[in-house]
UniProtKB/Swiss-Prot annotation:
Function: Tetrapolymerization of the monopyrrole PBG into the hydroxymethylbilane pre-uroporphyrinogen in several discrete steps.
InterPro entries: HemC, Porphobilin_deaminase_cofac_BS, Porphobilin_deaminase_N, Porphobilinogen_deaminase_C, Porphobilinogen_deaminase_C_sf
Reaction(s) catalysed (UniProt annotation): 4 porphobilinogen + H2O = hydroxymethylbilane + 4 NH4(+)
One BP annotation, GO: protoporphyrinogen IX biosynthetic process
S-(dipyrrolylmethanemethyl)cysteine carried by residues: 242
EC number(s) on file: 2.5.1.61
Pathway where this protein functions: Porphyrin-containing compound metabolism; protoporphyrin-IX biosynthesis; coproporphyrinogen-III from 5-aminolevulinate: step 2/4
Protein name in the entry: Porphobilinogen deaminase
One Pfam match: Porphobil_deam
């Protein structure tokens, strides 16, 4: 019987909150296991003055954590699923996810409640090319400023007038207890499609660690695990990075069928392709691959 688990995570307030949510799930099934949080500073945390697509993509938020996992310095890692590239090291696996939080984006703005009502040539802070593509589609006149850092720092920049608005994920704001209806306005899926895996907390382990597999099997939220399969397959087949605007959102039509909306764009944001697929849960991965192939052919 395992007595303790070393859990690796980024050393940010949100990452630590998410890690404690995983620990709470573990404790429900294994109350006697001691869970030690191992905060790890990643390259993505250190480099804040450049867009992610210029410095290696979201994998920079995982590199050091995954290496610690491979080196057996930690037993499992907790990530935001949206930060995990389509392809991960062959010796690692996403073994569990928690129940998905609402994956919508949020317009954070003091004086306006929607992208459409922002003043002409307003400045939006964002570093995500997916959001940039949608913003340019909705309002080509808007200016987009590279905007990185944690949620608190981005909101502070907004409050001091550095930008007119920014876009953040609802899941992160909610977990930080930072969603304020006075200046946080939900954006519907029909306007901005979420990032692949947005709103999902993922647990990554070594493939050969049977003890961790047993724990992950207990805490895994199977409905969410099934939902993310077409999204992740889409991402994996595209082998996309932060320079490719892509999005995907899956939802259950009933107990056995999933509808997934996909989007694929170009860095210059001149073209966005959309596709919707409906599939049985048993063939959901194939659905994501099919969508990727068809959409690549349209580019």
């Amino acid at each position: 019987m395992i007595n303790s688990i070393r859990i690796g995570t980024r050393n940010s307030t949100l990452a630590l909150i998410q890690t404690n949510l995983v620990i709470a799930q573990i404790k429900q099934f294994f109350p006697d296991i001691n869970c030690e949080i191992v905060p790890i500073i990643t390259s993505g945390d250190l480099i804040q003055n450049k867009p992610l697509y210029d410095i290696g993509g979201k994998a920079l938020f995982l590199k050091e954590i995954e290496q610690a996992l491979l080196d057996k310095k930690i037993d499992l890692a907790v990530h935001s699923l949206k930060d995990i590239p389509g392809r991960i090291p062959v010796d690692l696996v996403i073994a569990a996810v928690l129940e998905r939080e609402d994956p919508r984006d949020v317009l954070v703005c003091l004086n306006y409640k929607s992208i459409e009502t922002l003043p002409q040539n307003a400045v939006i802070g964002s570093s995500a090319v997916r959001r940039k593509a949608f913003i340019k589609k909705i309002r080509p006149d808007l200016n987009i400023k590279v905007f990185r850092g944690n949620v608190d720092s981005r909101i502070k920049k907004l409050m001091t007038g550095e930008v007119d608005a920014t876009i953040l994920s609802y899941a992160g704001l909610k977990r930080l207890n930072a969603f304020n209806k006075k200046y946080c306005h939900l954006i519907e899926y029909s306007q901005i499609l979420p990032c692949v895996g947005q709103g999902v907390i993922a647990v990554e382990i070594r493939k050969d660690d049977n003890a961790m597999f047993n724990i992950c099997n207990q805490i895994n939220h199977i409905p969410t695990f099934e939902l993310i399969k077409p999204e992740r397959a889409f991402l994996e087949h595209l082998d996309a990075n932060c320079s490719t605007p892509i999005g995907a959102y899956s939802q259950y039509l009933d107990a056995y069928n999933i509808q997934t909306d996909f989007m694929l764009g170009k860095l210059d944001c001149n073209k966005i392709i959309f596709q919707t697929e409906i599939t049985n849960i048993n063939t959901s991965r194939e659905c994501g691959i099919k969508a990727a192939k068809m959409m690549l052919a349209q580019q």
